[in-house]
């Protein structure tokens, strides 16, 4: 089957399966001073494929500087 990101067809998003807190994560890159995303509303999006996985977001003033993790 296809992954949630493949189903969503998000351009510019890279999915990186990992074991960080037993959750997968994805990275979305945008231009400087840009913004990504919007509020997720159940009446506008099919969230049934998420199962028990939580939605998480970053973007508050206290979270503007995020650490960069690289793995090779």
From Swiss-Prot:
Regulation: Unaffected by EDTA or Ca(2+), Co(2+), Cu(2+), Mg(2+), Mn(2+), Ni(2+) and Zn(2+).
Alphabetically ordered keywords of this record: Hydrolase
Catalysis performed (reactions): phosphonoacetate + H2O = acetate + phosphate + H(+)
Keyword ATP-binding: no
Keyword 4Fe-4S: no
Cofactor binding notes: Unlike bacterial phosphonoacetate hydrolase, does not require zinc as a cofactor.
Enzyme Commission code(s) on record: 3.11.1.2
Thermal dependence of function as given in the entry: Optimum temperature is 52 degrees Celsius.
UniProt note: pH dependence: Optimum pH is 8.3. High activity between pH 7.5 and 8.6, rapidly loses activity below pH 7.0. Loss of activity below pH 6.3 is irreversible.
Provenance organism: Penicillium oxalicum
This protein's name: Phosphonoacetate hydrolase
MF terms in GO: phosphonoacetate hydrolase activity
Lineage: Eukaryota, Fungi, Dikarya, Ascomycota, Pezizomycotina
Name of the top EC class for this enzyme: hydrolase
Oligomeric form and interacting partners: Monomer.
